[in-house]
């Protein structure tokens, strides 16, 4: 359940949640509805705050503007707690049927291409009380703790998450790299 909780938060508050979750739990989720593009696809811009994550596909209209995203610690460390803090604004109510397409690569190797039901994840997990429908408006200082297992393999992970409404309108696109060094470094 922790994996799904993180993926839902990705859609709303940043790819930070996919940084840990797909790495520790790939293979969990629903059948793909729409395959995500490779990480870094389209134009990107940094998300304000302390994280390695960027908004992607910025030329497309998006229903979520992430105004701040912090990862503590940044970069994340295996065997420790990752605290994700985010603020943003949703411009349209998000209804049942919303989903998140996630792709995780280790270098050029694709580890995960998965679709997650956003509302189901929110119902099953505590993401600061968010449930569908998610009303339009500003959301400040949302926070989620994630335990990153010691067993996360070393390497540079490239993550892309695209969230869509039930009508396939883009909620957000987030991409980024996270490096986990070999143990002892």
Swiss-Prot record:
Residues 1-20 form the signal peptide. Residues 21-43 form a propeptide. It holds the Pfam family E1_DerP2_DerF2. The lineage of its organism: Eukaryota, Fungi, Dikarya, Ascomycota, Saccharomycotina. GO terms for biological process: intracellular sterol transport. The keyword Transport applies. GO terms for molecular function: phosphatidylcholine binding; phosphatidylinositol binding; phosphatidylserine binding; sterol binding. GO terms for cellular component: extracellular region; fungal biofilm matrix; fungal-type vacuole lumen. Monomer. This is Phosphatidylglycerol/phosphatidylinositol transfer protein. Keywords: Lipid transport, Signal, Transport. InterPro entries: GM2-AP_sf (IPR036846), Ig_E-set (IPR014756), ML_dom (IPR003172), ML_PG-PI_TP (IPR033917), NPC2-like (IPR039670). The gene is NPC2. Belongs to the NPC2 family. Catalyzes the intermembrane transfer of phosphatidylglycerol and phosphatidylinositol. The keyword Signal applies.
